[in-house]
């Protein structure tokens, strides 16, 4: 049986299936790794791409590596971040708003949360209340919040983009936020 390494598989995903799938695959390699492990994986991906120079789809693999991120926490965050990048939008990832709340993606004052259905399955009342308080607090600080589900991103990308731009327009009308987001926990 012939096998490939995980980095080679991620590169081949770019070559044969496109940048979006490859970014999700590459991002998944970084999860659960130490910073040293993440750097090692980036180097392995780059070396694999270099070895395949001149082969079909290597340019896509290079682009996917540029777009890959050690911060992504789910394949659907990776996918939507890549879609945003294709639209010319550079969202910030895993930003802290205040000391208690970290958000998936941030575009100006628009918070974009990618929520899996499992998060809500059989959710206890206390958890629902905690989530509601979190969202209310974020809005009270001047942020607009957009929730997207994986099934929406996959099957209604155009609808997600329409909702994104509508939410961004609302966010821009809110004005300045009272608690700026930071990349580190304050």
Which stretches of residues belong to each language-model region?
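Glutamine-centric residue-chemistry signal
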Residues: 92-94
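Short, composition-biased local secondary-structure segments
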Residues: 43-56, 97-111
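Basic, glycine-rich
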Residues: 96-101, 107, 111-186
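Phosphate-handling catalytic interfaces
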Residues: 1-90
